[in-house]
């Protein structure tokens, strides 16, 4: 996809409206995880160093088009200022005279944060008039919030079509990584899709089987595929009503030349709790009272061999109930092997989705993957092959 890049922009003295994701977790008015603030720092610093007036647009929570004082972004200004090591001015609105006054007072290289864009109903309606009001305070637009790119909102889509628009540095890095994983990957490509339900990942599976050489299915959704293949999964989580759909995906994979890797052995227990008695069984030997909670060692060995044979890995969803040891072993083994291959340059390893990020953190390897996306819904919709409005609006 062709985009303008910030290094080609004339920035000195220009007002740069920058869409960031500051929808941070908060407890008692304090930010408990500042990852999203830190993700925006390179773009803010770059623009500031080039003499731009940096004006930050963001949403927080779901005020539904009304001013809700406890959903104000005012609390972000001070921690952001500390991270940047420079003052951050706060405007009590994102449009109108209050916003204009703060921007007018900025010196070149200065930074301002506007109030929650979702305090205006026009934001989530992608309203052209509201976008035009936002645009009054900018000479150019930068979107650095890939995590909000699947939403066609005024600050992510309509605004990008009014001003000269650019992806921010974090957005560009995400787009480059995703292109390397699915857009234009080195083959063979292996996908790992885990999680509990087939029903939540139907579009994902249908899209991936047409693009991958191998697809390993794990987690609770693997039970549905085993059930569809007339294999008894005992007392395991299983969407029996999705059996026909699972068979359709098996047929789609066969037609596309994608090799499906389903569990051949599993780790079972009678309940999900730490320290419970766990057993490894061949999938054909699962007992009526067994609950499948992880992939077995033979299944993992097959998966690692597929990794060794691949040049690209894309991963979404854990292979078992990784939060409860010992049912984390398959996920941890696969994650560590992928990280080792990525670190040595043998594979491009891209992962994303909330549970996946948590699983890689649990395995202690998220820093060794080529790229780990924290974008959640946007990452999933991209994997499903859907157009992301906030990305397509940036195309030249």
From Swiss-Prot:
Binding site for substrate: 21-23, 36, 59-62, 118, 151
Record's subcellular location: Cytoplasm
A GO molecular-function annotation: ADP binding
Residues engaged in binding ATP: 201, 323, 353-356
Pathway participation: Carbohydrate degradation; glycolysis; pyruvate from D-glyceraldehyde 3-phosphate: step 2/5
GO BP of this protein: gluconeogenesis; glycolytic process
EC number: 2.7.2.3
Entry keyword NADP: no
Record keywords: ATP-binding, Cytoplasm, Glycolysis, Kinase, Nucleotide-binding, Transferase
Keyword Transferase attributed: yes
Main location group: cytoplasm
Protein family per UniProt: Belongs to the phosphoglycerate kinase family.
HAMAP family hit by this protein: Phosphoglyc_kinase
Subunit organization: Monomer.
Descriptive protein name: Phosphoglycerate kinase
UniProt source species: Caulobacter sp. (strain K31)
Gene that produces this protein: pgk
């Amino acid at each position: 996809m062709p985009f303008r890049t910030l290094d080609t922009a004339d920035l000195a003295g220009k007002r740069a409206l920058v869409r960031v994701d500051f929808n941070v977790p908060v407890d008692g008015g304090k930010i408990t995880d500042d990852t999203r603030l830190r993700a925006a720092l390179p773009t803010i610093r770059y623009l500031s160093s080039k003499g731009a007036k940096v004006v930050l647009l963001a949403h927080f929570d779901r005020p539904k088009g009304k001013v809700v004082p406890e959903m104000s972004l005012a609390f972000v200004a001070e921690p952001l200022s500390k991270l940047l090591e420079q003052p951050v001015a706060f405007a009590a609105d994102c449009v109108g005279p209050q916003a204009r006054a703060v921007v007018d007072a900025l010196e070149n290289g200065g930074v301002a944060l506007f109030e929650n864009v979702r305090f205006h109903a026009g934001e989530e309606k992608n309203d052209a008039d509201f976008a035009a009001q936002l645009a009054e305070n900018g000479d150019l637009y930068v979107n650095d919030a890939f995590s909000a790119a699947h939403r066609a909102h005024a600050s992510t889509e309509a605004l990008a079509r009014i001003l000269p628009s650019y992806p921010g540095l974090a957005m560009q890095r995400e787009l480059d990584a995703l292109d390397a994983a699915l857009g234009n990957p080195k083959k063979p490509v292996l996908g790992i899709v885990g999680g509990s339900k087939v029903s939540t990942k139907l579009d994902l599976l249908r899209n991936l089987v047409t693009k991958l050489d191998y697809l390993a299915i794990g987690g609770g959704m693997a039970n549905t595929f085993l059930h569809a293949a007339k294999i008894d999964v005992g007392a395991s989580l299983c969407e029996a009503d999705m059996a026909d759909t699972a068979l359709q995906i098996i047929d789609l994979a066969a037609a596309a030349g994608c090799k499906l890797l389903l569990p051949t052995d599993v780790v079972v227990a009678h309940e999900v709790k730490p320290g419970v008695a766990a057993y490894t069984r061949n999938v054909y030997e699962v007992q009526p009272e067994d609950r499948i909670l992880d992939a077995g060692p033979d299944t993992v060995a097959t998966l690692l061999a597929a990794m060794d044979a691949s040049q690209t890995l894309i991963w979404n969803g854990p292979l078992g109930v990784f939060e409860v040891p010992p049912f984390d072993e398959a996920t941890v083994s696969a994650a560590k092997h992928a990280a080792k291959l990525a670190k040595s340059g043998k594979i491009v390893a891209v992962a994303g989705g909330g549970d996946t990020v948590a699983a890689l953190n649990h395995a202690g390897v998220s820093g060794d993957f080529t790229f780990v996306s924290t974008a959640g819904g946007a990452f999933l919709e991209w994997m499903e092959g859907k157009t992301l409005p906030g990305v397509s609006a940036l195309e030249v």
